Amino acid sequence: MSRRFTVTSLPPAASAASADPESRRHSVADPRRLPREDVKGDGNPKESSPFINSTDTEKGREYDGRNMALFEEEMDTSPMVSSLLSGLANYTNLPQGSKEHEEAENNEGGKKKPVQAPRMGTFMGVYLPCLQNIFGVILFLRLTWVVGIAGIMESFCMVFICCSCTMLTAISMSAIATNGVVPAGGSYYMISRSLGPEFGGAVGLCFYLGTTFAGAMYILGTIEILLAYLFPAMAIFKAEDASGEAAAMLNNMRVYGTCVLTCMATVVFVGVKYVNKFALVFLGCVILSILAIYAGVIKSAFDPPNFPICLLGNRTLSRHGFDVCAKLAWEGNETVTTRLWGLFCSSRLLNATCDEYFTRNNVTEIQGIPGAASGLIKENLWSSYLTKGVIVERRGMPSVGLADGTPVDMDHPYVFSDMTSYFTLLVGIYFPSVTGIMAGSNRSGDLRDAQKSIPTGTILAIATTSAVYISSVVLFGACIEGVVLRDKFGEAVNGNLVVGTLAWPSPWVIVIGSFFSTCGAGLQSLTGAPRLLQAISRDGIVPFLQVFGHGKANGEPTWALLLTACICEIGILIASLDEVAPILSMFFLMCYMFVNLACAVQTLLRTPNWRPRFRYYHWTLSFLGMSLCLALMFICSWYYALVAMLIAGLIYKYIEYRGAEKEWGDGIRGLSLSAARYALLRLEEGPPHTKNWRPQLLVLVRVDQDQNVVHPQLLSLTSQLKAGKGLTIVGSVLEGTFLDNHPQAQRAEESIRRLMEAEKVKGFCQVVISSNLRDGVSHLIQSGGLGGLQHNTVLVGWPRNWRQKEDHQTWRNFIELVRETTAGHLALLVTKNVSMFPGNPERFSEGSIDVWWIVHDGGMLMLLPFLLRHHKVWRKCKMRIFTVAQMDDNSIQMKKDLTTFLYHLRITAEVEVVEMHESDISAYTYEKTLVMEQRSQILKQMHLTKNEREREIQSITDESRGSIRRKNPANTRLRLNVPEETACDNEEKPEEEVQLIHDQSAPSCPSSSPSPGEEPEGEGETDPEKVHLTWTKDKSAAQKNKGPSPVSSEGIKDFFSMKPEWENLNQSNVRRMHTAVRLNEVIVNKSRDAKLVLLNMPGPPRNRNGDENYMEFLEVLTEQLDRVMLVRGGGREVITIYS
């Protein structure tokens, strides 16, 4: 459940008013912190926000005073400083752990007891828990063996390196922990909030796996103590000979380990509070055992304990099979053989055949614990690494060896090495003994002052444990015989725990103490690991783990406990403590490495929010700690290190792939920002090299009234061009003012982002609010991008229905867009019939992408189909390139040159040269030009005032009447409908009908009248300031004259304009129309069935009076083609033949 805190504002007059109901109305709880079931977000449902954010505190919304009346209207968003400070000062966070369980059990009758504020100090809250978690099974079961194998010098270096690693990590952790209020949840929250959801999830799961395998290691240590030192007779599997003892022991570990794991998981499931209450008992066992070791060291200096060991030559003998360390014994006056004789000879008789080594060497007995004053430290100073199956021998003892290659009988009672040892292996086995430094930060919610207690308690605990470990290395080497140290299971000292032989007053103190301490550590791991997994699951950054965020009603992570037990069982099935230890070393080292990385990144970035209260840190220390962790990972086991890093990398990429939506203000985001800033500043130094040129797209989309993208196919096409690996900015313009339309802009931006995510477009979204569309588009073109990372290509759709639009600003905006991209040296891509472009799910199984290379304005025409064919939609389409040859061109040579050029460009395409001979301008072209100019003339009239328009139309009518007497009427008529303005405007009536030529094959457009039988569009318009133009096509192919359609609206005047003489037409327009018609004929002939046609887009006229003619040219050029992309280069894009 969520915890809410209440900030109460009292009038300054009376403190007794707090009992008044009126004063209680100032206590306002944040509704976002009300109890709820499905807690999402930061993974800690009991954490209220400690950040200074006015939206998090609704205190002060009811204001009665007059002193601050100037700010009374802003009280809903800006609370009073007094209430804010009160809320921050009283901020508390409950611990994550067994508190939920205890609270649920203490709640009776639906009433909750008031939650006591945490009162734990540094000693009880941090120091002792860290001691309990750091001291563990390795200290009691393996440290003596490590010292015996590696020697005092190498063991000292090993312990020093490992302790330095944890000390440097603790310094980094202290800096992170004191950088603000520490939320309950500990190390995972510090890492995830410092490094972001991707690293946080990856490292959090590695930390969870490490904690889980630590539980397996503690359970295996418990079983080893139980079967090897407490109750050896409990072993289920017995070895028939010495060679089978190791396998039998592993099977016993698996069986008993599974049973102990089941019991521990049941205890954790039933009553977690008992685990926490017995934690001090387990800690007492650890401290008592360590004190017993030091007491034994002191006693051994003047009164060494009696633990004799038996040597045959220089070989160590196991005490399991005999009692007297001698070959012969005296019984009365008779010499008899001992049990040791029987182990090496065929019988107990003196004349029996005995082992050759046994015959040649004497049996001697020495003290296993000579004591600190014995000077043994010199002998144990250097290493004695062993291979598996080798007998443990004492250096310096006389021995008569055997011939080389003589096999050793494994049934003889020697002490054998059970594994091959080397330095890196010992590091992996030893390192888990220094883990557990996060115990204090994990209890941050219990602490009175976490920012003070965590650094002090953790560093003191590490210093204490490091001193114990380093001193133990020296003392073990100074007090215990080397062969005993190398005897892992104490076979030479009657099966006693080696470290127990040094303890005072009895070895049983160590045995029993270590047994309970390992049990307690295992229970703690099974308690903490599920809660860590629950926190990760509740964060929601790893979707498939969200089921483990649920649990019992009291908050216990039932499902997480079940998964933890299953993973822990994997470690138990491994069954070897020496094999499990390096595994958890990997996961803990990776966690510590990222703690150091987080501190180093935050320090180097110097973000304003990085203000740790702990001052004794530096980025060099964090970097050294990170490097040490990484080195130790590969020193311990390079293949385990690679596996751990692979697991973390897969988790990272999975979280990144699924889209981590958490924003925690983490250091990696800051690192990305700094890297982006550095890269952008580098890009500012100069334009990109030719080889680095790639299309950086600015996609201009239009949104409807509901802020949804009108043509999503534009973004599909953008996604299909993603092989360019360039920048993508999707922009849109909303008309209006920023103050009024800001919410709509936000909705439009969200809608565009959703569509970008659906179409898998990687890029940015930018919505601009402007008083008019023209200025907004211009702002986007000018200001899109940042620094050197700016767009160089604009992708826009062709303005549909531009003829029909009463507001002719639509196509004027488009032409201005073309001019601005040309002025800015930007490439322009215009998609015509964009609704017919394929979506990403579609696939073309055949077809072609046809490129009509008419003029060379850069390499865009070649590059675009190359990029498109990398996408699954266009992959099976072949590429065809057409170029146009004039009369004086050698078409054969042109084809060869183009083929060679494509070969050097590494582009595969079919090449064809189309010959377009000069021909006379057809009557069809003249008629198209005539219609275009008449329409242009009428469009100009629409921008005149009423009186100017009437005078202009009258002059056209008079001119037309004169033309009728000279020319025959044509078959298509033009009717101008002028709405009725006033009564005085209805004086003149048209004297006669004027008919103009309009070819039947002219391209249909939205402004064309429908076919006969359909109502023409727009006849009901009555806008008094507009003239409506209606074209009516011929009904018959015989081009018979057709009478005018009746006028339905009253008061409408029909004015007719007769076509001017053909010789009066603008010859430039005629030539351009001729080019458009001829090119269109050629393109349609060759590319009618192409899946996509790309061709050069001609530029707009320099004289703005011909803008509407430009639109007509483009319409004629692209008619009867399904999918067209007009490409206009900016002059900077280049496709190069060089590598």
Curated annotation (Swiss-Prot):
Catalytic activity reads:
K(+)(in) + chloride(in) = K(+)(out) + chloride(out)
Q: Where is the protein localized?
A: Cell membrane; Cell projection, Dendrite
Keywords, ordered alphabetically: Cell membrane, Cell projection, Chloride, Disulfide bond, Glycoprotein, Ion transport, Membrane, Metal-binding, Phosphoprotein, Potassium, Potassium transport, Symport, Transmembrane, Transmembrane helix, Transport
Where is composition skewed (Low complexity) in this entry?
1003-1012
The activity regulation comment is:
Inhibited following phosphorylation by OXSR1/OSR1 and STK39/SPAK: phosphorylation takes place downstream of WNK kinases (WNK1, WNK2, WNK3 or WNK4) in response to hyperosmotic stress and subsequent cell shrinkage.
Task: Give residues where Phosphothreonine occurs.
Answer: 57, 929, 1030
Q: Which residues are glycosylated?
A: 314, 333, 351, 362
UniProt xrefs under InterPro entries: AA-permease/SLC12A_dom, KCL_cotranspt, SLC12_C, SLC12A_fam
Disulfide bridge positions per record: 310-325, 345-354
Q: In which tissues is it expressed?
A: Highly expressed in brain. Not detected in other tissues. Highly expressed in pyramidal neurons and in neurons throughout the cortex, hippocampus, the granular layer of the cerebellum and in groups of neurons throughout the brainstem. Barely detectable in dorsal-root ganglions.
Concerning PTM, the database record says: Phosphorylated at Thr-929 and Thr-1030 by OXSR1/OSR1 and STK39/SPAK downstream of WNK kinases (WNK1, WNK2, WNK3 or WNK4), inhibiting the potassium-chloride cotransport activity.
- According to the record, the segments passing through the membrane are 99-120, 130-151, 175-203, 230-250, 251-276, 403-420, 430-453, 486-513, 535-555, 556-578, 593-615, 616-632
The molecular function GO annotations come to:
ammonium channel activity; chloride transmembrane transporter activity; metal ion binding; potassium:chloride symporter activity
Which residue intervals are annotated with compositional bias (Polar residues) in the record?
46-55
Q: Which residues lie on this side of the membrane: Extracellular?
A: 121-129, 204-229, 277-402, 454-485
Start and end residues of each stretch annotated as Disordered:
1-62, 95-116, 943-1025, 1033-1052
The residue spans the entry assigns to the Cytoplasmic side of the membrane are as follows: 1-98, 152-174, 421-429, 514-534, 579-592, 633-1139
Acidic residues bias: where?
Answer: 982-994
Q: List the GO terms this entry assigns under cellular component, sorted alphabetically.
A: cell periphery; dendrite membrane; glutamatergic synapse; membrane; neuron projection; neuronal cell body; perikaryon; plasma membrane
State the superkingdom: Eukaryota
Residues that, per the record, bind chloride: 184, 414-415, 569
GO BP, sorted A to Z: ammonium transmembrane transport; cell volume homeostasis; chemical synaptic transmission; chloride ion homeostasis; chloride transmembrane transport; chloride transport; dendritic spine development; hypotonic response
Protein family: Belongs to the SLC12A transporter family. K/Cl co-transporter subfamily.
Q: What does this protein do?
A: Mediates electroneutral potassium-chloride cotransport in mature neurons and is required for neuronal Cl(-) homeostasis. As major extruder of intracellular chloride, it establishes the low neuronal Cl(-) levels required for chloride influx after binding of GABA-A and glycine to their receptors, with subsequent hyperpolarization and neuronal inhibition. Involved in the regulation of dendritic spine formation and maturation.
Q: How does it assemble?
A: Homodimer; adopts a domain-swap conformation at the scissor helices connecting the transmembrane domain and C-terminal domain. Heterodimer wHeterodimer with K-Cl cotransporters SLC12A6 and SLC12A7. Interacts with AP2A1.
Q: Would you tell me the protein name for this molecule? A: Solute carrier family 12 member 5
The organism encoding this protein is Rattus norvegicus (Rat)
